């Protein structure tokens, strides 16, 4: 049915409106100036018409708006200055690759899974204001994303778990990121090809480093200076990280409660580094490996 002429000027909530439908109408003329909630509006649809002129200045919630859709239309001029929730906005939107570099993201708090499995997206978003974002978990998981995001303000972020999981193209410079508030880095570079310098990252608030470099066959950076005094989980951290060969014996592992299979399959780790790591980590009763053999005088 043609609903292009509907008077929507008083509508405040359009959440889930067309979710899971086959509807693909012309909505370009709709007055959306009063709408505050657009979450899941077109999720799981074939929606792809022109909505470039929509007034989104009042919208605060766009989470999962285009999740699992065919959408790939121009929304570059949207006013996103009031949006706080962009969680999953383009989740599994495999066609989307539009220029959204000019979006005002200064109010955004959640970018969780925003581009999860959005395999086409590779636009420059280096200028985004991310100073209010607290959750970037899964943001670029399963993507081909690799633009420069070195200047992002990550000072408020607490959760980066699985942020680049299976993001096999990503290897940009993020050495200067402020990670001082991050508590969770679980699986951050799991099954990725990342090998950037993150030696200066402040991980003093992190409690979970499990799976961080699992199955990452490229990573081999010096992270010996990390403050790991609050970390409680290191299980699977370097599991099958076949290129990693660094001495991290200076790490404080006094709070770690699980090292399970931390280095299983880390075939690149030298015997000398195994010895050094063992001599420090062995003071923790939960240490997983019997690597004393690598410290024998005959080695």
Give the ranges of each region predicted by the language model.
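Negatively charged
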Residues: 1-299
């Amino acid at each position: 049915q043609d609903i292009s002429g509907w008077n929507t000027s008083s509508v405040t909530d359009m959440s889930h409106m067309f979710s899971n439908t086959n509807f693909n109408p012309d909505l370009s003329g709709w007055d959306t100036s009063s709408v505050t909630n657009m979450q899941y509006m077109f999720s799981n649809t074939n929606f792809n018409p022109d909505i470039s002129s929509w007034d989104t200045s009042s919208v605060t919630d766009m989470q999962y708006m285009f999740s699992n859709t065919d959408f790939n239309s121009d929304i570059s001029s949207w006013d996103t200055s009031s949006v706080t929730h962009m969680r999953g906005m383009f989740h599994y939107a495999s066609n989307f690759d539009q220029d959204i570099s000019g979006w005002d993201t200064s109010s955004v708090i959640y970018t969780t899974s925003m581009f999860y499995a959005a395999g086409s997206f590779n636009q420059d978003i280096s200028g985004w204001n991310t100073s209010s974002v607290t959750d970037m978990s899964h943001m670029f998981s399963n993507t081909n994303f690799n633009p420069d995001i070195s200047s992002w303000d990550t000072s408020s972020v607490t959760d980066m778990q699985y942020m680049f999981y299976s993001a096999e193209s990503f290897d940009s410079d993020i050495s200067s990121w402020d990670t001082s508030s991050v508590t969770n880095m679980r699986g951050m570079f799991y099954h990725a090809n990342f090998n950037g310098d993150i030696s200066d990252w402040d991980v003093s608030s992190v409690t979970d480093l499990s799976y961080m470099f699992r199955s990452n066959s490229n990573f081999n950076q010096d992270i010996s200076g990390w403050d790991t005094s609050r970390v409680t989980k290191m299980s699977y951290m370097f599991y099958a990280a076949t290129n990693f060969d660094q001495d991290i014996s200076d790490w404080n592992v006094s709070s770690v409660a699980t090292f399970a299979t931390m280095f299983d399959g880390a075939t690149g780790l030298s015997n000398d580094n195994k010895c050094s790591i063992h001599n420090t980590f062995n003071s923790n009763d939960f240490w997983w490996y019997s690597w004393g053999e690598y410290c024998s005088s005959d080695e």
